[in-house]
Amino acid sequence: INRLIRCKIRRIGVFKVGRFFAEAESFENLGGWVVDQQSMNIMGSSYIMAHGLGSPVANAVTHIKLPESGKWYAYVRTRDWTAVWKRGTPAGTFKLMIDDVGFENTLGTNGEEWDWQYAGAMELEGGKTLRMSLRDLTGFNGRCDAVFLTTDKNDIPKNTEEFRREVSGVTAEEDETLYDMVVCGGGIAGTCMALAAVREGINVCLIQDRPVLGGCNSSEIK
């Protein structure tokens, strides 16, 4: 086995003039929001969820600096997780805020599939530290994957893997290391297999799509 792809990921920050991207799970303070990894293999990242059992949770907060002043258009990748039951009113809704001022549109109302929802537009000052936050409105599991800001009203984010890699700063490199064995999955079986092989002097690559090892016996399962 002599060819593997290694990814480098930048989670939050400006990557192009007139654009800004932030992963929700990389906010400095998640407040009452929690990180959920259940769709990581589909989405390419975790997302955060406002699990308040019907009571709005504390805001998730981070601080940003935009590259220029002007009118910024905001999009949030989210979904209405209750839309599949056609109940009429989305259960988990929230607002995107800058310095405690909310964009005009309520989020989490855009259908059952993950997609970019337009939050609204706002005049923002470049080069100044701004407080960006997610304000939960219901406490019923509103979901937020990422935030995208742009000064171009025609720069509408695409719900594609290619766009996601571009804005998240993901680059792929060939790993020139030669491996004797590749183990896919860091559950109990995969972790034990990889450790046993290493102890026998085998050069092993363990591939895992979770932040911790252990599978159903990991700290993710509570």
Task: Give the location of each predicted region.
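Aromatic pocket-lining residues of Rossmann-like dinucleotide-binding sites
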Residues: A197
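Beta1/beta-strand and adjacent pyrophosphate-binding region of the FAD-binding site
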Residues: D175-G187
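Conserved dinucleotide-binding and phosphotransfer motif residues
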Residues: E200
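Short beta-strand "acidic-cap" motif of Rossmann-like dinucleotide-binding folds
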Residues: N203-Q208
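Conserved N-terminal glycine-rich FAD pyrophosphate-binding loop of Rossmann-like flavoproteins
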Residues: P211-K222
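N-terminal Rossmann-fold NAD(P) dinucleotide-binding loop
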Residues: G190
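Extracytoplasmic
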Residues: I1-E173
